[in-house]
């Protein structure tokens, strides 16, 4: 990484320090999640395009169609597994750099396919899988990197902004797909696929001169480098009081968590007791599972096909309506930026679940008569579904695992949650075409299935998911200690535990039997909370 000190001895990266440097890191994070969203949406307009099916006729088979789309999720799953095993060893910066390179290689392989040769389809599938590996690497790393380089008070908002950019990326993909339908046949699918390189290249170039996570450096004993980066993130000289204090805070947190060489054993994920590592792992990973089983990617990946097969529109109109739907998706995704702290995570989960369930009920109910006029109601249901999803379930499963898991297991638990996301993503994307074509219900059986899934999720969220809004990460640890020690529901424990200042958290931790070097970190000062960098979000 390249930095230059100014005349005051403050390190600069890309000519920026302090807030400016944090903005550059945010730009990288949002660009990568734009790419994430673009990848999710790009195949939706291509997979049923005549120009694509002429070049790759195998996708006319529903099972093969599902495989071509879902193989991307397999790649993402493999990328997340890679980070689960090697992320702490490689570091945040190198992981992101590697992910961007892998994605570019995958794109090149896809657009270099030359139909109608026998191996063209296989080459396209391999390239799509490799692109997914790169995306899996980055989506498992970027949220952690941004959190570790950001201020604690805007942790939730920043991760929700990342989620909002998934919707915006999908919007861009839909409209590029639609515009390319008016070009020559090879352009219809080659250009939308190739456009992914733009986002990946921005990430790649910017990461060349952006810093590593100071928290990761400290877990690996690279103290001087970490101090330089903290100084740059603060916009202060290395020997300033704030930088020195933050260094001490991070080092104490790492020691308290039992990090040795930056490694946490997998066995730590499965412990209970006052820390409830396993329960918290399940809460985070199951939120990703429920996001996928709610039907989101059945709608995002296959919106044009849903319209063509279930409602009877032609391909161009289906693409146009898909683009309009993605505008709605993007608009409502931005509402989470402002609602996540005011309304809370738990209430947003519940509101989204009810809205998504009713939207799917509307869609399958409107398709039962099998008439063109009634099927228009199904379109309304898909529009309302994506609005509720964008405002609630899109960002929350990325935020909740980052908050709910404790310092000691957070990196591995977050990677496990991402693995869960891509595993269930593959399952849903694979079975959706078969469900649409093979249920013999004019498509309404597909929507009935997702309505039932959302109905099941409501009591799970209501009874098992505690609220984390407005809590420091230390207070969230105390919620689980209170629930375990006092034998009560963790949802109730979250409601009963009062808001605390740092010294109160310390006293309560002692009451529950946590020592200064146990699993909980309780030694932040008020000035550290105000300064923000590398306090709550440092772990």
Language-model segments: what does each one mean?
Residues 1-234, 248, 254-539:
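Alpha-helical transmembrane bundle of multi-pass membrane proteins
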Residues 232-244:
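Short intracellular "coupling" helices and adjacent cytoplasmic loop segments at the cytosolic face
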